[in-house]
């Protein structure tokens, strides 16, 4: 009875606190009544309610090196005591180091082989905005009719107007009226021949194609290699700038440095974007381009006040130093195998698990039912997990998650799935 009373009082205190906080927030989020106060590794803590959670979300694929990583804390402390911000009116040494490191490590690990230059910004949507602007600039230098963009259904590229315009979900776009014009959405699951036919017909008015090698929010769907090769060859043939959005699927999440690493050169993009894990929670984004794109850019064509600041780049240097190591990437694959084995065992017991898919530690678990109850009941039992559509769980933990923690989280998930299956 005493414990029940403590839980009840904690719940009241949590509700009171979250209600007072919500009073000052714009109404664009639907958050549960918990208040996260600290984290360590793959654990998060709500000290208001005296709760501990296993984290399978990692800030939506952001904290790839875990929460409150001691080494990152040291980097932030040291750099913030040295130099935080200068603007892009001047060079800073951390940005210079990081740009070189990002380009060269991309090539070394089998990614974009003609990567040449980097534009730093503060988020994924900004990185995609830059990619769209750069590609339109490139196209208009050769033909004023090439203004269109090809994107794909179930895509997500960001919330600002440009990246939102190439995000397919109507619920995100329609409340804001007209978007950037000349955007066409194709179905990435269509046969290659159908995609090729449309692209060839519309190539004279198409500036760029943007896609996620693995669709994240759209349900964790991996684009087959042969399709990426075909699209890459087609874009090169018709002078269409190819953009890969690697914001969620990149930087080690698949057990490769980039999701397009080790693909044939024909499938490599002209531009790829990254953010999320790049700063392990510190706001940072980057747009990596080849010479074909860079050669048309001039001073003043684009810019940012904060992008590439010394503090962000110091963190980025540290993150990349740790992730761009083959043993680290191999360890991601090993942990993915632990997840896959556990989830396949779960699927055998509960047939309403329709499919398990993804790559590395970007995993989708599709059910025949809505997953909102699974998410809420898991949270009640100490596991944080998120969705990718109405009937798909998305598992995107820290890349450093321990195998014991994986198994503990899967035990919680199994208890919830078992309860829902029998109800």
From Swiss-Prot:
Keyword hit for RNA-binding: no
PTM sites of type N6-(pyridoxal phosphate)lysine: 276
Matches recorded under InterPro entries: AcOrn/SuccOrn_fam, Aminotrans_3, Aminotrans_3_PPA_site, Class-III_PLP-dep_AT, PyrdxlP-dep_Trfase, PyrdxlP-dep_Trfase_major, PyrdxlP-dep_Trfase_small
Subcellular location as annotated: Mitochondrion matrix
PROSITE patterns assigned: AA_TRANSFER_CLASS_3
GO cellular component: mitochondrial matrix
Reactions it catalyzes: N(2)-acetyl-L-ornithine + 2-oxoglutarate = N-acetyl-L-glutamate 5-semialdehyde + L-glutamate
Keyword annotations of the record: Amino-acid biosynthesis, Aminotransferase, Arginine biosynthesis, Mitochondrion, Pyridoxal phosphate, Transferase, Transit peptide
Cofactor(s) needed for function: pyridoxal 5'-phosphate
Family named by the database record: Belongs to the class-III pyridoxal-phosphate-dependent aminotransferase family.
Name by which UniProt lists this protein: Acetylornithine aminotransferase, mitochondrial
Origin species: Eremothecium gossypii (strain ATCC 10895 / CBS 109.51 / FGSC 9923 / NRRL Y-1056)
Lineage of source species: Eukaryota, Fungi, Dikarya, Ascomycota, Saccharomycotina
């Amino acid at each position: 009875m005493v414990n029940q009373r403590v839980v009840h009082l904690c719940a009241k205190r949590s509700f009171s606190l979250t209600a007072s906080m919500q009073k000052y927030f714009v109404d664009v989020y639907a958050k549960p009544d918990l208040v996260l106060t600290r984290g360590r590794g793959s654990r998060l803590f709500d000290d208001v309610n005296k709760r501990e959670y296993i984290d399978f979300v990692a800030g939506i694929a952001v904290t790839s090196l875990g929460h409150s990583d001691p080494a990152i804390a040291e980097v932030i402390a040291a750099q913030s005591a040295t130099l935080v911000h200068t603007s892009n009116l001047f060079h800073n040494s951390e940005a210079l180091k990081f740009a070189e490191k990002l380009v060269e490590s991309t090539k070394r690990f089998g990614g974009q082989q003609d990567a040449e230059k980097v534009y730093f910004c503060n988020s994924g949507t900004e990185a995609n905005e830059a990619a769209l602007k750069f590609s339109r600039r490139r196209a208009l230098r050769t033909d004023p009719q090439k203004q269109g963009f090809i994107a794909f259904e179930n895509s997500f590229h960001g919330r600002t107007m440009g990246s939102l315009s190439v995000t397919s979900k109507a619920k995100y776009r329609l409340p804001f009226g007209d978007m950037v014009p000349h955007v066409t959405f194709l179905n990435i699951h269509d046969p290659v021949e159908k995609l090729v036919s449309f692209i060839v017909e519309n190539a004279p008015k198409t500036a760029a194609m943007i896609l996620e090698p693995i669709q994240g929010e759209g349900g964790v769907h991996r684009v087959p290699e042969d399709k990426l090769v075909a699209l890459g060859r087609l874009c090169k043939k018709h002078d269409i700038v190819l953009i890969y959005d690697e914001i969620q699927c990149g930087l080690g999440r698949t057990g490769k440095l980039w999701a397009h690493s080790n693909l044939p050169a024909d499938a490599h993009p002209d531009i790829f974007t990254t953010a999320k894990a790049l700063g392990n929670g510190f706001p940072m984004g980057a747009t990596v381009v080849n010479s074909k794109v860079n050669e048309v850019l001039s001073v003043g064509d684009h810019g940012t006040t904060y992008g590439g600041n010394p503090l962000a780049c110091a963190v980025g240097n540290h993150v990349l130093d740790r992730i761009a190591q083959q043993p680290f990437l191999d360890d991601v694959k090993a942990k993915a195998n632990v997840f896959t084995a556990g989830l396949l065992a779960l699927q055998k017991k509960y047939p309403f698990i329709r499919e398990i898919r993804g790559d590395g530690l970007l995993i989708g678990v599709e059910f025949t039912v809505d997953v909102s109850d699974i998410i809420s009941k898991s949270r009640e039992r100490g596991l944080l997990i998120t969705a990718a559509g109405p009937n798909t769980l998305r598992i995107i933990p820290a890349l450093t998650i321990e195998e014991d923690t994986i198994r503990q989280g899967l035990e919680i998930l199994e208890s919830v799935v078992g309860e829902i299956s029998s109800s």
